[in-house]
Amino acid sequence: MKRWIMVLPLAVFLLVAVFLYRGLYLDPAELPSAMIGKPFPHFSLPAVEGESTLTQADLLGKPALVNVWGTWCVSCRVEHPVLNKLAEQGVRIYGVNYKDDNAAALKWLKDFHNPYQLNIRDEQGTLGLDLGVYGAPETFLIDAKGIIRHKFVGVVDETVWREQLAPLYQGLIDEGRP
């Protein structure tokens, strides 16, 4: 019995060390999403601009990025110029203005330009909840049928676009070509 008391702390230490060692090789930016491979959630929410109501059907037809953003999000301000540049290059981007005041969102888009073909107002965060959003910015890649193919958590900068999202986006574009 005395021997077990002496060995137990060593065994616990080794077990904890193995888990910590394994954690060194995990990517903290890579958060698994249960939504990958599933249709974009059904929603009926107002547009940020204008009086129209948008639904998931408005997102169908072509591959697109769906960017979750907010005026309160400092990182969103960092990625916004990259999104503007991508939109100028013809990349289809839809916005989800997450848990934000609509007047603030309109001012933001006026001040920093609007890269979004459609911009969904999600003031209560219901769509964000259905998407499994942890915060902002988060960007989803959807195919022409509205299936979520990829989720990226964090700032989409030029490196992230070039190395991660652009190849996936281009692959979806190529799938749709005859």
What are these regions (language model features)?
Residues 43-65:
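A short beta-strand-turn-helix
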Residues 62-64, 68-72, 135:
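Short pre-active-site segment immediately N-terminal to redox-active cysteine/selenocysteine motifs
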Residues 42, 90, 116-117:
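A generic structural signal for alpha->beta connector loops
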Residues 6, 110-115, 122-178:
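Thiol/disulfide oxidoreductase modules built on the thioredoxin-like
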Residues 1-46, 178:
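N-terminal targeting signals for export/organelle localization
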